[in-house]
Amino acid sequence: MKLKKTIASHLMTFLITCSLYSQENLGSWNILNATLKINSKWSAFGETQLRSLSFYDDFHYYEVKAGGTYKISKNFSATTGFGSYNTYSEGGNFENPIQNKEIRTWIQINMKNPLEFLTFEHRYRAEQRFTNNGYKNRFRYRLGAQIPINNKTIEAKTFYVSLWNELFFTNKEPYFERTRLFVGCGYEFNNNVAVQTGYIYQFDYKINDEIGRDFMNIALLYNFDLTKEEKEYIPKTSD
């Protein structure tokens, strides 16, 4: 418990420092996610995102997506989904011309490694991207961890720490495209609702143009369980 409180204390200090960062450099990354558990094997999800390059100004991106997950075993599942992803020019709110209009599908493998007081998550995703600049493939790997603070597991009335880092690759040179880091915390009110906030750093690699972006992330997560089994709900986003 002492280690958990130390981790939470350092995380809060880090997030407060980020929130005091210049608003001209800190963007906003907002997520609304809903999951529907149909039975012990199948679940569906829907998610929408809205992003800005300044703190709740210069909105340049939004996405809407949905999909389904099949639970193969306790710690192993497969996901498929599709969505619409839209990126506008910088310098205003949804400034035209639009830079990228994309329809995306993907298949994904999810694996969990639960340990004594935290759970590691591995996510492997292959994306098929139909953009206004042609068809593209992309491959993503995300390693994450969640640590409950005031309970042994993430359950109702639990504060938790969430950490992950994701790498993006393509099948064309220079192959490495992006890395995305998240450091945050959340609170699960009950088995249906959780809220999460944190800091996202996204680095986009281009041959002669390396760009890093900073975002304050806020996510509201809903879980609707048709089975009424009252099992552990692990809050997480779909992106």
Question: What do the predicted segments below correspond to?
Answer:
Residues 32-36, 66-70, 107-113, 126, ...:
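Residues on the lipid-exposed face of transmembrane beta-strands in outer-membrane beta-barrel proteins
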Residues 106-109, 213-239:
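Outer-membrane beta-barrel "beta-signal"
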Residues 113, 117-204:
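Outer-membrane beta-barrel transmembrane domain signature
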